Amino acid sequence: MAKKIVSDLDLKGKTVLVRADFNVPLKDGEITNDNRIVQALPTIQYIIEQGGKIVLFSHLGKVKEESDKAKLTLRPVAEDLSKKLDKEVVFVPETRGEKLEAAIKDLKEGDVLLVENTRYEDLDGKKESKNDPELGKYWASLGDVFVNDAFGTAHREHASNVGISTHLETAAGFLMDKEIKFIGGVVNDPHKPVVAILGGAKVSDKINVIKNLVNIADKIIIGGGMAYTFLKAQGKEIGISLLEEDKIDFAKDLLEKHGDKIVLPVDTKVAKEFSNDAKITVVPSDSIPADQEGMDIGPNTVKLFADELEGAHTVVWNGPMGVFEFSNFAQGTIGVCKAIANLKDAITIIGGGDSAAAAISLGFENDFTHISTGGGASLEYLEGKELPGIKAINNK
C-alpha cells in the first residue's frame, strides 16, 4: 500500500509535528556537514507555504549522562535552519513542560519551532529510545497532525517517531517518501537489470543485505575490505588483508550457489602498513604478498566494475571500495563513483553511510538519482525488513 505523504494533508492553521533527522556532525559547536538539514528543507518549506505551524523534533547523538547535554544541544541546528529558511526558528531548550507548551501556543501560521534534542529524555529511563508510551502520547498532544521525515531513524521504534504516530494522523515527509520510493523500490519493485555494489570493511555488516539482494540483483559487485573474505573462500592468497574467518563458509556457499552473479576484484593496491604514506604496489588479487594488506581495489578492477555496470537500469551502492579516508587509497571509490555517475539512463542510488559520505566529499552528490540519508535504516531496508518508522505512517 502507498503511504500518505505531507501533500495529502490539510495543513492550514494546523500545528504540524515534524520528526526530522538533524543528527548532524558537530565540531566545537559548529555543524561540519549540513546535508541532513538541507534534505529536510522541502518538507518544512511546503508546510510553511500551506500555512501550517511547525514543531520540529530530532535527536542528536547519544545522550548518556547529564554532561552530554551541553555538547548535544540542537541550538546550532536552529541557528543554521533559521539562515537557510531566512526566517526565525524558535528554539525551545526543553523537551516537555509549560515553556514548550506556551511557545507552541504562540505560533502563527508559517512559524517554525525546534524542540530540544529528543534524546535528553533518555537520561530518565531511556524514554525516547525505548518508546515510552506516555512520552509519545504527550508529544502527540502538542499537535494536530504528524509528519515523519526522518528516514535515518525509520529502523528504530522511538517515542518521537512511532510513539507520536500512534496518536495522530501520520504522513511521510518528502524525504521519507523519496527514500521509500528509491531504497524501497530496489527491494520491492526494481527496474531490471539490477546491479548491487557492496563494499566496506566487513561481510558481517552486510550479510543480510547480500542474502536478500542475491535474489533481486542480476550482479553483485563486491569490493572493500569484505572482498578479501570472498577471495580467501576461493583459496586465494590475501596476505594480512582484513579477513573474517567465521564468514568464509558463508562466502563459499554464496559463491557456489550464485557464483555467476558475483564479481570480485582482479587486482588490489597493497601496502605493508595501514598508512596513507605507505609504499603502494598493485598486485593481482589472487597473489597478495604474505606481509602486505589490501587497501583499495586496483585500476583493472575499476575498469572491470565499470564494464559490469554497463546496461544496468538500477544500481544500488553501499560501502566504499577501499580505505577512502586515505587519499592514496581513494582511487577505487572515486573510480566507482565516476562509473556510476556516467550511467545516464539508470536509476542510481547510494544506500547511505560511508558511501554517501564518500560521494558527497568527492563532489558527486548531484550525479546520483538518490543519495540516502540513512545508514542503518538503508541497510535494514535493503535486507528486506519492514521498518517500524515506515510501518507507522498511515496508508493512503
Swiss-Prot record:
Keywords: ATP-binding, Cytoplasm, Glycolysis, Kinase, Nucleotide-binding, Transferase
EC number: 2.7.2.3
Compartment list: Cytoplasm
Reactions performed catalytically: (2R)-3-phosphoglycerate + ATP = (2R)-3-phospho-glyceroyl phosphate + ADP
Gene Ontology molecular functions: ADP binding; ATP binding; phosphoglycerate kinase activity
Pathway: Carbohydrate degradation; glycolysis; pyruvate from D-glyceraldehyde 3-phosphate: step 2/5
Keyword Transferase belongs to the record: yes
PROSITE patterns: PGLYCERATE_KINASE (PS00111)
GO biological process entries: gluconeogenesis; glycolytic process
Cellular compartments per GO CC: cytosol
Record has Transmembrane helix as a keyword: no
One Pfam family linked to the record: PGK
Residues reported in the UniProt entry to bind substrate: 21-23, 36, 59-62, 119, 156
Enzyme class: transferase
UniProt binding sites for ATP: 206, 294, 325, 352-355
Family: Belongs to the phosphoglycerate kinase family.
Description of how the protein assembles with itself and partners: Monomer.
Identification of the protein by name: Phosphoglycerate kinase
Taxonomic classification: Bacteria, Bacillati, Bacillota, Bacilli, Bacillales
